Curated annotation (Swiss-Prot):
Group of enzyme by EC: hydrolase
Gene Ontology molecular function terms on file: 3'-5'-RNA exonuclease activity; RNA binding
Signal peptide interval: none
GO terms under biological process: gene expression; rRNA catabolic process
Oligomeric and partner information: Component of the archaeal exosome complex. Forms a hexameric ring-like arrangement composed of 3 Rrp41-Rrp42 heterodimers. The hexameric ring associates with a trimer of Rrp4 and/or Csl4 subunits.
NCBIfam families linked: ECX1
GO cellular component: cytoplasmic exosome (RNase complex)
EC number(s) on file: 3.1.13.-
InterPro entries: ExoRNase_PH_dom1, ExoRNase_PH_dom2, ExoRNase_PH_dom2_sf, PNPase/RNase_PH_dom_sf, Ribosomal_Su5_D2-typ_SF, RNase_PH, Rrp41
Protein name: Exosome complex component Rrp41
């Protein structure tokens, strides 16, 4: 988080934010499932100005015997930001941040997967950020979870994610880029709504105990709204398949 330029107001006296949203309002979100033919499962998400695609391959045999687990599959996650995804061109390939976020996303997704059904195999998840606008980890988790469901991987529940944060002393939902850059805190959360389980909880910045509790509650509420959009995206795909089958008969 950076020092805020003089005169920049992230939230006005009417509670309107820099992009016109209210304090507890999500950015516009669009999701589509089954966007890549060559992957076992895939999903595309637009969340604000974020554009992210996720692909899943597997379960497939692990040829490196030393990596195999005799009792379960292993989940491998690669999160990557395309060089053109941000205003200042970044070097191709993984950097420290991408490696850290890959681990975070793996930890958020793993509790939802029934990996014991596929011993000695790997499930590989690739997340490519095509355009970045704050909140890429929660959008990446959301897209990856959809792609895993699309691949038919047995799951206890979908994983939905959202962040809350603090700007100019106010707890708000779903920070955009300016708010993330110049705000005081960011709290990404991932949940399995059916089980009421939290699979990811992080905090960047400074909050009081009361503010932290408020931010977590707000992020969970946001994630539940995201979960409904995930379900709608999956439903849309399978209704389309059913329609195609019906028409071909």
């Amino acid at each position: 988080m950076m020092e805020k330029p003089e005169g920049l107001k992230l939230i006005d006296e009417n509670g309107r934010r820099i992009d016109g949203r209210k304090k507890y309002e999500l950015r516009p979100i669009k999701m589509k499932v089954g966007v890549l033919k060559n992957a076992n499962g895939s999903a595309y998400i637009e969340w604000g100005r974020n554009k992210i695609i996720a692909a899943v391959y597997g379960p497939r045999e692990l040829h490196s015997k030393h990596l195999q687990r005799p009792d379960r599959a292993i989940l491998r996650v690669r999160y990557n930001m395309a060089p053109f995804s941000v205003e200042e061109r970044k070097k191709p390939g993984p950097d420290r941040r991408s490696i850290e976020i890959s681990k975070v996303i793996k930890g958020a997704l793993e509790p939802a997967l029934i990996l014991e059904m596929f011993p000695r195999t790997s499930i590989d998840v690739f997340i490519e950020v095509l355009q970045a606008d704050a909140g890429t980890r929660v959008a990446g988790i959301t897209a990856a979870s959809l792609a895993l469901a699309d691949a038919g991987i047995p799951m206890r529940d979908l994983v939905a994610a959202c962040a809350a944060g603090k700007i100019e002393g106010e707890i708000v939902l779903d920070l955009n880029k300016e708010e993330d850059n110049y705000g005081e805190a960011d709290v990404p959360v991932a949940i399995m709504p059916l089980k009421n389980d939290i699979t990811l909880l992080q905090m960047d910045g400074y909050l009081t105990k009361e503010e932290f509790i408020e931010a977590v509650r707000l992020a969970i509420k946001g994630a539940k709204a995201v979960y409904q959009k995930q379900r709608e995206a999956l439903k849309e795909k399978y209704l389309k398949i059913a329609q195609e089958v019906e028409e071909s008969e």
